[in-house]
Amino acid sequence: MGCCFTKRRKSEKAEGEEEQPKLYSWDQREKVDPKDYMFSGLKDETVGRLPGKVAGQQFVIQDCENCNIYIFDHSATITIDDCTNCVIFLGPVKGSVFFRNCRDCKCTLACQQFRVRDCRKLEVFLCCATQPIIESSTNIKFGCFQWYYPELAAQFKDAGLSIFNNIWSHVHDFTPVSGELNWSLLPENAVVQDYVPIPMTEEFKAVRISTEANRSIVPVSRGQRQKYSDESCLVVLFADDYTTANARKLIDEMVGKGFSLVQTKEMSMKTEDAQRVFQEKASDFLLLLNKGPVIALEFNGDDAVQECHLIVNGMFNGTKMFVSEKKETASGDVDSFYNFAEIQMGI
């Protein structure tokens, strides 16, 4: 006589056995404590976050007085509310930096968008990919971002920001007052460290910082300051493995010879764009446009066109670049490219 065995069905649970809840991807994310991404109600302190400690999160700074605040990392957005007499450094911000109801603050920061509302007496060394905007604010002063530490270049990439897209001086005032100017540019000889000093506390000694212009991750440009000369030169570099390095090398050479860097831009171009900007020379560059965005540089100074040609032919022989052909048409080259760039930004 045989024995009869029955298997327990999978749907049946052994006595005392509890069904485990399902785990979803959003349940497995690392829990974020908002307190780790906030400085609030501080007074007379030096605080900050080291590289890797913010890692693209949002950050809030509020109700701080007489504080030195350093965020040595990239973030999503940062709001600064109700702060007085503070020194603030912000690494690259993917979205917006928004100051509200702050006064007597000195800052160095990089972001996609910069907004100031209900503030007075801010001094800002800025890298901003879009037009900085102020509203209901007075005595706001701007200079070009000028800062270096080893992790900063990678943080710009993580934040999706180009070091060449910086219109720091193209400020728009939403609430202008007739006969008054609510914003201005910092003195040309302003020393960044006099405004935003390198932190000397033990926590930040490991961050190898420099505020020298020739080491700044973001090229230091004149922006809308008056040009020294009537002669400018446009140089456009096309995408390859060394485009950024070549642009930096060319800037170093030209600035080292006494020329000024007025403005920079990194953006994609189509065939019709190249034909409009480069005109009869466009056919020389059409195949290069598919490789990636171009980098444009405007240099200013007497004999800028001649010197650009000498440097490009001597240092970058074999690398295709557009360089203004002669000084009589160089200003037209600059206008054609940057007018095109402004139109693209408005689309």
Swiss-Prot record:
Retina (at protein level). Residues 1-11 have a biased composition (Basic residues). Residues 1-22 are annotated as: Disordered. It is a lipid-anchor. A lipid is attached at C3 (S-palmitoyl cysteine). It comes from the Eukaryota. It is found in: Cell membrane; Cell projection, Cilium. The keyword GTP-binding applies. A lipid is attached at G2 (N-myristoyl glycine). Residues 21-176 form the C-CAP/cofactor C-like domain. InterPro entries: C-CAP_CF_C-like, CAP/MinC_C, CAP_C_sf, CARP_motif, NDK-like_dom_sf, Tubulin-bd_cofactor_C_dom, XRP2. Myristoylated on Gly-2; which may be required for membrane targeting. Palmitoylated on Cys-3; which may be required for plasma membrane targeting. One of its GO terms (molecular function) is GTP binding. Keywords: Cell membrane, Cell projection, Cilium, GTP-binding, GTPase activation, Lipoprotein, Membrane, Myristate, Nucleotide-binding, Palmitate, Protein transport, Transport. SMART domains: CARP. One of its GO terms (biological process) is protein transport. GTP binds at G95, S96, Q112, Q113, F114, R115. GO terms for cellular component: centriole; ciliary basal body; cytoplasm; cytoplasmic vesicle; cytosol; Golgi apparatus; nuclear body; periciliary membrane compartment. Pfam families: TBCC. Belongs to the TBCC family. Found in a complex with ARL3, RP2 and UNC119 (or UNC119B); RP2 induces hydrolysis of GTP ARL3 in the complex, leading to the release of UNC119 (or UNC119B). Interacts with ARL3; interaction is direct and stimulated with the activated GTP-bound form of ARL3. PANTHER family: PROTEIN XRP2 (PTHR15440:SF0), XRP2 PROTEIN (PTHR15440). Acts as a GTPase-activating protein (GAP) involved in trafficking between the Golgi and the ciliary membrane. Involved in localization of proteins, such as NPHP3, to the cilium membrane by inducing hydrolysis of GTP ARL3, leading to the release of UNC119 (or UNC119B). Acts as a GTPase-activating protein (GAP) for tubulin in concert with tubulin-specific chaperone C, but does not enhance tubulin heterodimerization. Acts as a guanine nucleotide dissociation inhibitor towards ADP-ribosylation factor-like proteins. This is Protein XRP2. The lineage of its organism: Eukaryota, Metazoa, Chordata, Craniata, Vertebrata.
